[in-house]
Amino acid sequence: MKENDVVLKSVTKIVVFILLTFGFYVFFAGHNNPGGGFIGGLIFSSAFILMFLAFDVNEVLKSLPIDFKKLMIIGSLISVATASVPMFFGKPFLYQTEANVTFPLLGHVHVTTVTLFELGILLTVVGVIVTVMLSISGGRS
C-alpha cells in the first residue's frame, strides 16, 4: 500500500495482537472445546493477511523471518509423524498418548499427542493460506 494511512496501520497493530492472542486461545482450547489447529490456523492467517493489507507486502515479509512454504511442509510432516508413529508400537493410526508432566515454572501439566498433531495442522493451514494469498496478490511467497 503506497498511501500513508495512519489509522489503518495503528488499528492493524492492535487487531493483529488480538487475533494472535485469540488464535493461541482457540488452538489450546481446541482439544476439549470447539477450535483447534484448523480454526487457530485460520485466525493466525487472518492476522498475517491483515498485516499484508495494511503495510507493504515486501516490508512485512522482510520483517517476518518466516518462509510460509517451509512452514506448510513442516506442519504436514509434524501431523503425519504424530499420526503414524504409534503404528510402529503396535497401536492404530492416530492413536492418542497422554502424560502428566511437571515443569519447573508451569507446574503440573496434562500433555497429549493431540496437541502436537493440532500444531502440525495449524502450521499447515497458515502456510497454505498465506502462500495462496501471496501468490494471488503477486507478492513473494
Curated annotation (Swiss-Prot):
Localisation per UniProt entry: Cell membrane
Superkingdom per UniProt: Bacteria
Disulfides per UniProt: none
UniProt GO cellular component terms: plasma membrane
UniProt keyword list: Antiport, Cell membrane, Ion transport, Membrane, Transmembrane, Transmembrane helix, Transport
Chief site of localization: membrane
GO terms, molecular function: antiporter activity
Any one Gene Ontology BP term: monoatomic ion transport
Membrane topology: Multi-pass membrane protein
Regions that span the bilayer: 10-30, 35-55, 70-90, 116-136
Pfam assignment, any one: MnhB
Complex formation: May form a heterooligomeric complex that consists of seven subunits: mnhA2, mnhB2, mnhC2, mnhD2, mnhE2, mnhF2 and mnhG2.
Similarity comment: family membership: Belongs to the CPA3 antiporters (TC 2.A.63) subunit B family.
Name of protein: Putative antiporter subunit mnhB2
Biological classification of the source: Bacteria, Bacillati, Bacillota, Bacilli, Bacillales
